[in-house]
Amino acid sequence: MNRTLLALLAIAVILSACGKTENTTPAASAPVAANVADLAAKAQVKAAAASLPQADAATPASSYVDITSGHQLMYSYLALSGVPPDYAAVAQRISREYAGSNDAFRKQEVLDALKPQIDAKVNEAKTKRYLRYQINGQGALSPYAMDKAAFPAKFADAGTYYYMYDNGDYKLAFTNCDGYSLLKVDQEAARKIEAARSGYKDFAIVVYAYAQEADLASNQVKAQIVKVAIKLNGEEIPVNQAR
């Protein structure tokens, strides 16, 4: 009986050891699987962005339209969406008379008068897809990184979008965010920008972008960043390199 008991104990030890090995293997591979999934997701996002209409980098600055109102983003969104405008919803945004009236007949008269104007704005947005948008530099740039000779930038982080207070229903987001996490300018300009940043002075990041598509799920105009400049004391300082 002692020999039988010893044999059973030996088998139990072997099985226990095998079980521990099998349990630890998946735990060790879990981070690897997560990393692979993350890389695959990023590759998919890049591929999707590459499949969209692309900007012509040679387009002159004079062809870019300054975005100063959320109504512009609304018209751009409608132009890119291919969906007929909801005239009543647009009128509610752009006309105080329409929004403030309780008279059904008067509202209809105002709406009928606005429809041609709305159509004209949407058609104009179809032909003007190059956009220029200014972002407050304070908070968008981190302190100058000496080891990288560049400003770490947060204005184009994945998931970031922008909207205007006069019409916050429509937003602007960028499709090639990963290429603009570090902004390089010449050394003299970097000193001036860092002095403004650290001294809480006003400066702006000027984004030149190309409207590519409308995201119907989020009311966003998706745009490709073409180039970036930093505006300080009324002068645009071109970003020499971004990555």
How should these model regions be labeled?
Residues 18-22:
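Bacterial signal peptide processing site
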Residues 25-26, 185:
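Extracellular/mature segments of secreted proteins
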Residues 8, 23, 112:
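Residue-level marker of positions within ordered structural domains that often coincide
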Residues 28-127:
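N-terminal Sec/ER secretory leader and immediately downstream segment
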Residues 124-243:
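Mature extracytoplasmic/lumenal regions of exported proteins
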Residues 16, 26-27:
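Long, low-complexity intrinsically disordered regulatory regions
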Residues 1, 27-28, 74, 146, ...:
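Detector for methionine-enriched segments
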Residues 1-16:
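Sec-dependent bacterial lipoprotein signal peptides
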